[in-house]
Amino acid sequence: MAVMKIKGAATVAGTWLNEAVSFVVFCILDIVDSFLCLLYKAADYLFEAEWKPCYCLSDKEPITTTRGKILLSHNNGESKILTLSPLQELGGRSKIELEDISETLYTRPSLISDISTISVNELNKRFVKVTRSESECSGHNEKTKNKRRRSLTKSSLTVNFTVVEMLRGKIRPQNLNHDISRWSDCDCGFCTSWASTSDKNHSLFVKTQIPNGVTAKEDVLFIHGFISSSAFWTETVFPSLSASSSTHRLFAVDLLGFGKSPKPADSLYTLREHVEMIEKSVLHKYNVKSFHIVAHSLGCILALSLAARHGGLIKSLTLLAPPYYPVPKGEKKPRQYVMKKVAPRKVWPPIALGASMACWYEHISRTICLLICKHHRVWQFIAGVLTRNNRTVNFLIEGFMCHTHNAAWHTLHNIICGTGSKLDTYLDIVRDKLKCNVTIFHGGDDELIPVECSYNVKQRIPRARVKVIEHKDHITMVVGRQDEFARELQEIWKTSSC
């Protein structure tokens, strides 16, 4: 009993210590990010002779016209996109729609501001309770005043010109040959290989594995996760699914902005862009009629979107560590809610610190990319010396470092945070309109995406089968047990084909 009390006290003390240290650290990071904002504006002008807009806010006076550009509304202190007029073509791809752009890109309150808002809201609730009886006496007059205030609020709309300039630059017709890389991005042959290919349409990089000597019976699409690449599959599962013994045609893509795929500097990396590039580069190009999907982490969101769009073609869904955080009913800011789940602004565990820095701080995350991604060849060389060119370490580093900050930043916000409220719809479509098998794998020691996310998916899709792999994390659920995982996949495909 005494031991249990000591452990409980230690847990509480550890939690409070984590909260206190996190508060101090992230308050400092708020200041550092603001300083880096000014530094990068000067550096961009120095190296590129152009002021590059960012998502830092600078409120301006309300106006009532946008002259056919981008309009932002102001509601309870939160700015959000109200309309885009006219919708512009994205170099042959479909038009940007409102729901494609997550407000978490430009509405990320500082920690002090966030805590202040919560405190003020709580005080307001208590004040309302105390003064309720008094307000009832003068209710009629107050209602009249409120109506007038609402009418005044509705008559004016706040435009944040910083965000307008950022989005205006992003939605212009894309020229994938322009601004191949920024000064803070890597310009090596590997990272810019897409720009030197003969493919004028700039499709995604796709690694294929075709059966030897036999006609492929079925197709399988592999989608990697965030800051990764197709090597996550081709260096692990593909060799275990030998071309000499397999009857499946395998496709592993590098997502837009990652690996060897195009990294357009003026893309918003929305869900629609990612999905349509997969459709163009795999489904249309290789004439795929029906297929299985295997997706990891962020790739699960794209897989569910594809399933919703091509329900009749999906033979099975295999999801690994799906980042599904159900948004409570009545939540006014679903994307903000998901962002705080993904990046809780905590220093412990370390993976939470990394996720928080990548998600909350545009300029700190750009600095990380400058130090790591731009110089990935140096880090790969050092890792090769230390590990004696370990193949697994090499491809993991390649996938982790070969992307641009623009791609990672927008993909994180527009896909993981921005689709929080959409996933319910996708899951309902899979549950009600698709008959394919749904299998979910999750590492028992995964600290990046909790196991609860997989069980949340099962609650939405009761027929889904969840398998928790004990003592494995977000990566080692595949890496290190690829032979076993390949056998599990073959069994899933065999069962789904019956």
From Swiss-Prot:
Give the EC class as a word: hydrolase
A Pfam family annotated for this UniProt entry: Abhydrolase_1
Q: List lipidated residues, N-palmitoyl cysteine.
A: C56
| Name of this protein | Probable lysophospholipase BODYGUARD 3
Point out the gene that encodes the protein: BDG3
Q: How does it sit in the membrane?
A: Lipid-anchor
All copies of the AB hydrolase-1 domain together span 220-326
Q: What is the annotated localization of this protein?
A: Cell membrane; Secreted, Cell wall
Name one process (GO BP) from the record. Answer: cell wall organization
Active-site annotation: H224, S297 (nucleophile), D446 (charge relay system), H474 (charge relay system)
Task: Name a single GO cellular component.
Answer: plasma membrane
EC number of this enzyme: 3.1.1.-
Task: Indicate the secretion signal residues.
Answer: 1-55
Q: What is its main location?
A: membrane
Q: Which GO terms describe its molecular function?
A: hydrolase activity
Respond yes or no to whether keyword Membrane is given for this record: yes
Going by the UniProt record, its keywords in alphabetical order are:
Cell membrane, Cell wall, Cell wall biogenesis/degradation, Hydrolase, Lipoprotein, Membrane, Palmitate, Secreted, Signal
Q: What does this gene product do? A: Involved in cuticle development and morphogenesis.
